[in-house]
C-alpha cells in the first residue's frame, strides 16, 4: 500500500522536528501545506509553452508518473520580518533560504525512502539551482507545478501565494501511484489581482526589476548574486518583494 497524504504530512512534520533539533539550525517554520496534481494534468504540457520547451513533464522525470506532490514550508514570522529593512537581504533570510533548501532535500529523501520500501518509484528535483544560468529558465518550476496542484495562486510579484502567504519555500516530488487531486483555488490571494488595491511588492523592489507589467529577471538575478557574495554562500536571495507586503504571511 502506498503512502497517504496523512503519511506524507507526518513524514514532513517529523523531518522538520528532527531537523530543528540540530543546534546549528536557526530557522523555524509554520505548519506545512500539501497539494497534489495528477501527472497527466494538461497544464504540465502547457508549461512547455509558458516557460520553455525544455520544461519537463512529470513522465519525463519519472516514467509511469501518476501524481505530483507539492508542499509549502511557510517561514515563521520573524524570518520575513528580519528582511524588511535595508537594501541587502538579511542574514536571517539568507540562512533560512539555505536551511530550508537542505530541509526540502531531507524531506524528499525521507519520503523516497518510505516509498522505495513499499515498492514505489519517485523523482525529486532539487529545491534550487535547477535552471539555466544563461537564460534563468527552470526545467522544473516548483512554483508553477505547485500552482497546477492547487497549492496557491500567483501574485503581482511572480511568486506563489498560498493560504499561508508567500514567505517560504516549495518542494515537490513525482510518484508512480495515484493520490487524491486538489482543486485549484478560485479566489485571488493577491490584492492587486483581487481588486487592484495593492502594489506594495513593486515599491519593495528598490532595484526596479519588478514593474506592474514587466519583470527583469537578469537584473533580479544580479541582486541575488550580490547577496550570495555578501554572505559568501549559496544564498542567492533577495526577497524584498516578498516581505513587508500583505501577502507575505496570511
Task: Briefly describe each language-model feature range.
Residues 52, 89-250:
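Catalytic cores of enzyme domains
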Residues 1-96:
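Non-catalytic, usually N-terminal nucleic-acid engagement modules in DNA/RNA processing proteins
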Amino acid at each position: 500500500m502506498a503512502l497517504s497524504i496523512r503519511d506524507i504530512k507526518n513524514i514532513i512534520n517529523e523531518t522538520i522536528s528532527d531537523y530543528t533539533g540540530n543546534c546549528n539550525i536557526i530557522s523555524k517554520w509554520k505548519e506545512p501545506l500539501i497539494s497534489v496534481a495528477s501527472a497527466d494534468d494538461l497544464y504540465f504540457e502547457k508549461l512547455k509553452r509558458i516557460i520553455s520547451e525544455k520544461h519537463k513533464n512529470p513522465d519525463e522525470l519519472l516514467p509511469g508518473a501518476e501524481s505530483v506532490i507539492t508542499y509549502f514550508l511557510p517561514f515563521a514570522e520573524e524570518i520575513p520580518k528580519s528582511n524588511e529593512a535595508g537594501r541587502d537581504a538579511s542574514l536571517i533570510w539568507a540562512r533560512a533560504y539555505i536551511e530550508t533548501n537542505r530541509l526540502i532535500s531531507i524531506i524528499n529523501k525521507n519520503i523516497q525512502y518510505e516509498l522505495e520500501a513499499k515498492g514505489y518509484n519517485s523523482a525529486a528535483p532539487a529545491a534550487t539551482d535547477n535552471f539555466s544560468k544563461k537564460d534563468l529558465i527552470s526545467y522544473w518550476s516548483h512554483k508553477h507545478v505547485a500552482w497546477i496542484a492547487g497549492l496557491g495562486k500567483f501574485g503581482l510579484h511572480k511568486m506563489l501565494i498560498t493560504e499561508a502567504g508567500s514567505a517560504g519555500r516549495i518542494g515537490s516530488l513525482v510518484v508512480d501511484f495515484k493520490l487524491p487531486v486538489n482543486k485549484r483555488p478560485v479566489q485571488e490571494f493577491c490584492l492587486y489581482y483581487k481588486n487592484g488595491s495593492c502594489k506594495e511588492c513593486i515599491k519593495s523592489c528598490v532595484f526596479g526589476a519588478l514593474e506592474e507589467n514587466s519583470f527583469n529577471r537578469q537584473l533580479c538575478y544580479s541582486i541575488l548574486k550580490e547577496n550570495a557574495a555578501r554572505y559568501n554562500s549559496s544564498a542567492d536571495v533577495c526577497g524584498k518583494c516578498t516581505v513587508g507586503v500583505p501577502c507575505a504571511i496570511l
